[in-house]
């Protein structure tokens, strides 16, 4: 099931344990021995990156090395050599370097579970003073749809049903229910665009790069009448992870050349 919303991941060990599980899976997938050294590349939201980076790095890079644990019947002994923290969303642009080269200014929109994090990028550099967060993430969108369907039909849909319909995937429901979900998806998109404009970002004037869980929803519910300058969607759910890996490789390369 979904982990409860936790704005500060360092308040308990949940995220740390998930990280150890992910390391074990990665080691197994790559055919590495269960006793090895690793480097972690992780991310934080644009709006809290500067504030939370030192604490989050310490949270992941603990003094009791190596870390010994058992996962799915296998004993692991992992030495975490390095932890590098990058801004979510911006790191994902490492996967699409042409975007940074072709546009002098763009708006980065990371549509997460609880928030939509916004930041302008000028000449390939994040403008940190423009960082803004809207509490319009996908959890709120799904909750609003569930309530609207219940109000109009008396039915109680699951998150999975709603998410499938928003993504245009199969789901056995009536046309009436599907219409409600699609109308709410469009309503959510309109609300998000309006809130973004109100936050001071002119979507008619600068291109927007959208990623995160909500990006596919917006991609299906945009309309030509919205009159947006240009929208680029990074819909691969691994785009941030790939970006972190490339960013870490670039940092390591610079260190070795220094």
What function would you assign to each model-found segment?
Residues 116-120:
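Short beta-strand scaffold segments in enzyme catalytic cores
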Residues 143, 147-150:
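Long, charge-rich alpha-helical interaction segments
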